[in-house]
């Protein structure tokens, strides 16, 4: 298990063209990123559509690569993924997908600040893990309304996840106004050492490996994580050239919200304990996006502003712009840039061994998660989409009504304003993201 940055996860989401509200805890954010990333070749048998006109199917093969280069704690995430959608009738669509995160690299298992008398840098440990996730769902469409439901099961050596999601939407005013309401519920379990609830947080130990997890091993325990996610979206087309989207998202989290592998130095003598976070967290975000098509340039320009706040006192702001242009009828390109900034969590300190207020303890909690420190980041990137359209009787490659391929690249740089490893600035603050995807409809 390793924790990836919220911004890296957000970048990965954008690479795949999906917008989600991140509501996972620190221990599971890497899993969410894995859900969005995909790399390596996927082989899938493609079946010709049946002659019946009501039968429509599409296949998506996604590939992407996340790399966080570093001399001591580099990280690589690859994830083959495939999705199949079949419509046996004009009102029902069935979906199924599979993905497998393949994670490798090194991570510092001990966090200490400028005053720590412990060698933090050489504490990086190498790891490798694979996560498998299966999703099944359906969509019912009737006139101007639709209902979608899905279930996902994910498993890896030290984590189990069960989640369902439901969304409903409608459009009116000649389809110029669209409303969407979504709810997701997660029932997760994370493996930790077998400390008792009555044990003092300062005496709890971190995991050193996943051996024995989810077995009868008396040195291991399973902790629950409850996730509730809500989202409300309003999309409005004002003119043929201008449209906006307003999205409100909220999340409630309860349970073990730390990293079971990470220890924090909490005393001048070098005493260390398992990372200790509050068991409850509420999160909210409000985003506004506008898109305007300039006919003279044949280019669509977009702007996005997003504000984030949670009960751990983190306040984040995201600003993004992009431009999309058809170079040819079959080739579309997009360039974009994004800036993100956030404040620190209420209990954050780079060093928990000193005194208040510049450094030292922050109440009863301590953390080694850089995503709870004050930081900012910028992202630049782009993607290209190639589409080949066919028609009945003249299919692409003899089987597809439509075939498309997309390639994307993003560069992400993070500025950590108050996070060190034993007084040293981490060198893993750059992330590179590649994506490659194919879609066939038949």
Where is each model-derived feature located?
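Outer-membrane beta-barrel translocator domains and adjoining extracellular loop/strand segments
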Residues: 71-76, 97, 107-112, 152-154, ...
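Transmembrane beta-strands of outer-membrane beta-barrel proteins
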Residues: 57-61, 94-96, 145-149, 177-181, ...
């Amino acid at each position: 298990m390793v924790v990836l940055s919220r911004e890296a996860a957000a970048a990965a989401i954008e690479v795949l063209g999906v917008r989600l509200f991140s509501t996972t805890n620190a221990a599971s954010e890497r899993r969410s990123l894995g859900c969005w990333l995909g790399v390596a070749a996927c082989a899938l048998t493609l079946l010709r559509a049946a002659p019946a006109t009501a039968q429509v199917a599409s296949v998506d093969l996604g590939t992407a690569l996340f790399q966080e280069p570093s001399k001591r704690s580099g990280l690589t995430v690859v994830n083959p993924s495939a999705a199949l959608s079949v419509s046996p009738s004009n009102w029902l669509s069935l979906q199924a997908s599979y993905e497998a995160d393949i994670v490798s690299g090194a991570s510092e298992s001990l966090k200490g600040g400028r005053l720590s008398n412990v060698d933090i840098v050489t504490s990086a440990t190498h790891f490798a893990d694979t996560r498998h996730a299966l999703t099944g769902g359906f969509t019912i469409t009737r006139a101007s309304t639709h209902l979608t439901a899905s279930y996902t099961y994910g498993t890896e050596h030290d984590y189990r996840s069960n989640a369902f999601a439901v969304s409903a939407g409608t459009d009116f005013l000649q389809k110029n106004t669209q409303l969407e309401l979504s709810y997701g519920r997660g029932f997760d379990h994370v493996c930790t050492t077998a400390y008792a609830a009555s044990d003092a947080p300062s005496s709890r130990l971190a995991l050193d490996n996943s051996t024995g997890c989810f077995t009868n091993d008396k040195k291991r325990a399973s902790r629950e994580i409850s996730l509730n996610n809500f989202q409300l979206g309003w999309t409005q087309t004002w003119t043929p050239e201008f449209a906006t989207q307003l999205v409100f998202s909220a999340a409630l989290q309860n349970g073990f919200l730390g990293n079971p592998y990470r220890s924090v130095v909490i005393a001048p003598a070098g005493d260390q304990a398992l990372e200790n976070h509050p068991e409850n967290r509420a999160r909210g975000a409000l985003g506004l996006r506008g898109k305007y098509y300039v006919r003279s340039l044949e280019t669509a320009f977009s702007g996005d502003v997003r504000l984030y706040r949670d009960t751990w006192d983190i306040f984040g702001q995201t600003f993004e712009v992009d431009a999309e242009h058809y170079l040819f009828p079959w080739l579309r390109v997009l360039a974009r840039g994004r800036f993100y900034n956030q404040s620190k969590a209420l209990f954050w300190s780079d060093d928990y061994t000193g005194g208040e207020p510049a450094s030292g303890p922050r109440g009863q909690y301590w953390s080694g998660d850089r995503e709870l420190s004050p930081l900012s980041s910028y992202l630049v990137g782009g993607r290209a989409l190639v589409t080949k359209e066919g028609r009945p009787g003249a299919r692409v490659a003899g089987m597809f009504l439509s075939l498309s391929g997309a390639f994307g690249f993003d560069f992400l740089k993070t500025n950590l304003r108050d996070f060190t490893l034993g007084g040293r600035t981490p060198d893993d603050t750059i992330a590179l993201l590649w994506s490659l995807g194919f879609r066939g409809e038949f």
